[in-house]
Amino acid sequence: MKYLSYYGSRLFTLFFIAALVSLASAQDKTKLKAEDIWAKHIESIGSKDAIAAAVNRKIEGSATVRNLRVTKATVTGGAFLASAAGKQVTLMAFQTSNPGDYSGERINFDGKKLEITLVTASERSPTGTFIFQYPEISKGYIFGGTLFSSWSLLDAAKVSKFELQGKEKIDGVETYKMKFVPKGGTSLTIKMFFDATTFRHIRTEYTRTETAGTVRSDEGRLNENRYKLIEDFADFSKVNDLMLPTSYKVTYRFETAQRANEFEWSMKLTRFSFDSAREPEIFLQKVIP
């Protein structure tokens, strides 16, 4: 009996180990690859027909801009986004009291040329300056994410690299973190984050670190200038058969040897208009207000 009990126990252990190995193997087979996440993300937006029917888009809502570190001031106004056949525009207009106050932002890419308004006689806003210095953010059809019909992931020809780099939690949400490189390349490090359950695109981060060339006397190492632009997308809702974010936030922060600051644009989008044939008037008039 002891002999049978011993070998019965051994057999049970072997079967248990085999079951675990089989389960691990099955999990490996079902582990998602980058192309799977990409495909599921497109499915999360809507059907091919619904996406095609919304090639021309107008989106309106409210906007606020905040200086998060220095003045901590908040200004409110309106937001307008439009896209059509490789064109995209982001407009914000803010209520101001004085002629020299920050009155708004205009980021316009017509498929060839990127234009970003000056907010003073000779300067763009810090956020606008960063986007202008790295035009691939807009020209690569990354900026604005799924809000624009020209979103880079809807066209493989716009993508050079889409690489899975594991999982990461964003505000408590488990996401797939992807390294992204647009066609034509970039000197930025670009990460995209996709909800691990719904595969919705909820964040893009653009970072740039530069050696300042001066040595910190206390640490004996070179100073670095750090720049980071973050786009956050939230409050997804079904709009004309598409699942799109209705909250859109752009945060830009920088830290240099001389100073540091952080700015935030926040938009609540409430009115969506899609058309399969006619471009938004803002493109037909060829005048961007």
Residue map of PLM features:
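N-terminal secretory signal peptides that target proteins for export/translocation
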Residues: 1-9
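Bacterial N-terminal signal peptides
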Residues: 10-22
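Signal peptide processing junction and immediate N-terminal pro/mature segment
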Residues: 24-26
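Flexible, processing/modification-adjacent segments and terminal tails
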Residues: 28-36, 43, 110-188, 212-227, ...
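N-terminal mature ectodomain segment of secretory-pathway/periplasmic proteins
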Residues: 29-30, 34-125, 158-166
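A short, sequence-level motif marking secondary-structure junctions
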Residues: 76-80, 113, 131-133, 236-237, ...
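Extended low-complexity acidic/polar segments
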Residues: 77-90, 94-96, 100-103, 252-256, ...
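Gly/Pro-enriched, hydrophobic low-complexity segments
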Residues: 167-286
